[in-house]
Amino acid sequence: MNSQQCVIIAIAGASASGKSLIAKTIFDELRRDLGTDQIGVINEDAYYRDQSHLSMDERVLTNYDHPKALDHQLLCTHLQLLKSGEAVDIPCYSYTEHTRIAETLTMTPKKVIILEGILLLTDPKLRALMDASVFMDTPLDICFLRRLTRDVAERGRTMESVISQYKKTVRPMFLQFIEPSKQYADIIVPRGGKNRIATDILKTRIQHLLAK
């Protein structure tokens, strides 16, 4: 492979479906072969639009499960720059402030970039940049229970707010946008991020792409 080739893998699916776990597993196992500086993970959440011009009351009303809440154009631009051998400054998003913060995270070009996010497969421009894509096909009720536990413990949310958001936007947007995007996935993974066979298949695919 030439020095600027970059394999981009996307892992999509419902919130709390196991995307982060399978991404971390692949990252940890491949970096031993490639080197820590040659593989990176980009979370789609980092590209939620800046809402610093809105009040907190207005920010909490945003439908974060709709594609319009995300700046996919910026993500596409960053991926194109990385593929061409240039570093990018990835935004940092605060789940408690519901907007971007001043800090950014610099990413240098990588041999492998793993994208993870709920709406990655809904955007045709993003799909065109992917070398392989995965959809985590975890039952929605299991995802909800995981999300409830995670958001209360890690993101400063109340149980009531998580349940309300699930009813108003998370479940409806999953049915409208996320689940239909499954048709664009190359690999559909049942049973969540601990599916070892699916993880090995994806790793083999990445290694095959790198060998081209």
UniProtKB/Swiss-Prot annotation:
Q: Name one GO molecular function term.
A: ATP binding
Superkingdom of this protein's organism? Bacteria
Q: Would you kindly state one Gene Ontology biological process term found in this protein's UniProt entry? A: CTP salvage
Pfam family example for this protein? PRK
- Primary location class: cytoplasm
- One cellular component term from this protein's GO annotations in UniProt: cytoplasm
What reaction does this catalyse? uridine + ATP = UMP + ADP + H(+); cytidine + ATP = CMP + ADP + H(+)
Look up keyword Membrane and say if it applies. no
UniProt keyword terms in alphabetical order: ATP-binding, Cytoplasm, Kinase, Nucleotide-binding, Transferase
Q: Which residues bind ATP?
A: 13-20
Q: Where in the cell is it found?
A: Cytoplasm
TM ranges: none
Q: What is its EC number?
A: 2.7.1.48
Q: In which pathway does it act?
A: Pyrimidine metabolism; CTP biosynthesis via salvage pathway; CTP from cytidine: step 1/3; Pyrimidine metabolism; UMP biosynthesis via salvage pathway; UMP from uridine: step 1/1
HAMAP family found in the cross-reference section: Uridine_kinase (MF_00551)
- Give the record's family classification: Belongs to the uridine kinase family.
Output the PANTHER family linked to this UniProt entry: URIDINE KINASE
Recorded protein name is Uridine kinase
Give the source species.
Shewanella baltica (strain OS185)
